[in-house]
């Protein structure tokens, strides 16, 4: 016979939610830092094509 699980307390729920949010904040900060590095051109770990646009004025 199936027995219902006990309800998770509010404190445990809030703790798990806070851990999840803090991990997401860390990942977002890391992504922002990486984007700044790539845009500044100081990144050594990525290779990407630089497209130069030439303006033709006649």
From Swiss-Prot:
The keyword Ribonucleoprotein applies. GO terms for molecular function: structural constituent of ribosome. One of its GO terms (biological process) is translation. Keywords: Chloroplast, Plastid, Ribonucleoprotein, Ribosomal protein. It is found in: Plastid, Chloroplast. Transmembrane segments: none annotated. The keyword Cell membrane does not apply. SUPFAM superfamilies: Zn-binding ribosomal proteins (SSF57829). GO terms for cellular component: chloroplast; large ribosomal subunit. It holds the Pfam family Ribosomal_L32p. Belongs to the bacterial ribosomal protein bL32 family. This is Large ribosomal subunit protein bL32c. It comes from Chaetosphaeridium globosum. The gene is rpl32.
């Amino acid at each position: 016979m199936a027995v219902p699980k006990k309800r998770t307390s509010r404190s445990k729920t809030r703790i798990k939610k806070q851990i999840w949010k803090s991990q997401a904040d860390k990942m977002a900060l890391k992504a922002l830092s990486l984007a700044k590095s790539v845009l500044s051109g100081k990144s050594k770990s990525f290779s990407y094509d630089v497209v130069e646009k030439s303006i033709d004025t006649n």
